[in-house]
Amino acid sequence: MKTIILALALIVLASSTQADVIATIKKIDQSPFGRTLFDTIWLELQTGDPLDRLLQTLTDLEDRYVAEQKEDDARNHEYQDACTVDIKAFDKDLAESNRKKIELEARLEGQLYPQRGILQGLVAQKQAEVKGYQKDLDELDAQRAEEKADFEEKVLEHQEATAIIAEARRLFADNIEHESFIQKGKATKQPAHKFTKEVASMIQKHFTTSAKKAAKFQHRKGYSKLFKAFATIASKVEQLADAGAVSKIIDLADELLAKIADSLSLLRFAEDKRVEAYKKSRNFIVISLTVAGTALANAQSDLAALNDVIAQVEASLDTTNQRIENVSADRNDRFTQCEEAVQDYQDARSARSSDRDVVSQTIGLVNKELRTLREQLALRQSAGEEI
């Protein structure tokens, strides 16, 4: 009974093993390379030649696959080592560039830009000071010019009034005609004079014209009334017949001339004081303007120099950013190449491993399962090239 069971077990095992062999044959035949091998084996079987040479060829092919894989492994290892070196070099370059970028940005944001803001504020402040001092200077000069013009007008009015009164005095004094003393017995006559209507008319006209002229004065308009009063006096010839009255008029003219001279002296004294004060004020403003102008020029020079430094640092930052962009692109390209090489290597290794497995399995079939292989190949031929 045990013998029967053992025999059945062996039969089942043999059937299972043969099914596995057939499955292996069909699997190999599904690949182009396996089909080519089977075609070659079938031809050898048809000729009846020994399969030793074919087995040797397959063995050599298997050995060549192993050798090629070792060479490919070595090349891949060398290439990937080069990739590692290149990627590390790119990473080092990027790290250095990023470090430099951070330093440049920190210098700009933490130092140069704040300094520029301070200098710009200082320049604006000094510009305002210069503008203010220049405005003060212009206003002071304008005020001085106005005061000078006002002074000159007053001087001219004094001079014109002096000329008018002096001329009137001359007319009064020069046109008095004295007569000789006439003694009749013990009787004595007082000196007499004549003040003609022509002279009175001339003096009246002189004062009337002068009054109109004085009415246009900007400062001493009172002269116009004075001259009108003199014109009125000159019109009364009968009053001028008295030499004493004329003398009083002359004395009044002398008094007026003296007062005008005193007024003019005071006017000139006040003008001298104003000029002195103007020169002091102007000198102070000019000094302040010069100091502010120098400070402005220095601040502008410092700002221009700082702007040059900022431009250089910004240019360096632009160059660094461009380098980071270029190196990053080169690194990505190199990384892609290395990854593609890895994939190509793995694909080639997988294909070579698959072909080597086919060769190994085929050698095993020829050595151990030649009868089954022959039958399956014959079936494939009879079935139209398909097992």
Swiss-Prot record:
- State where the protein is found: Trichocyst
- Signal sequence bounds: 1-19
Describe the PTM.
Two components are produced by post-translational processing from the precursor peptide.
User: Would you tell me the Gene Ontology cellular component terms?
Assistant: trichocyst
Q: Which portions of this protein are annotated as coiled-coil regions?
A: 51-163, 294-333
Provide the propeptide boundaries.
20-48, 184-239
Q: Does the keyword Signal apply?
A: yes
Key words, A-Z: Coiled coil, Signal
Domain of life of the organism encoding this protein: Eukaryota
User: Can you tell me which family this protein belongs to?
Assistant: Belongs to the TMP family.
Tell me, in a sentence or two, what this protein's role is. Answer: Structural protein that crystallize inside the trichocyst matrix.
Write the protein's name.
Answer: Trichocyst matrix protein T2-C
Q: From what organism does this protein derive?
A: Paramecium tetraurelia
Lineage of the organism = Eukaryota, Sar, Alveolata, Ciliophora, Intramacronucleata
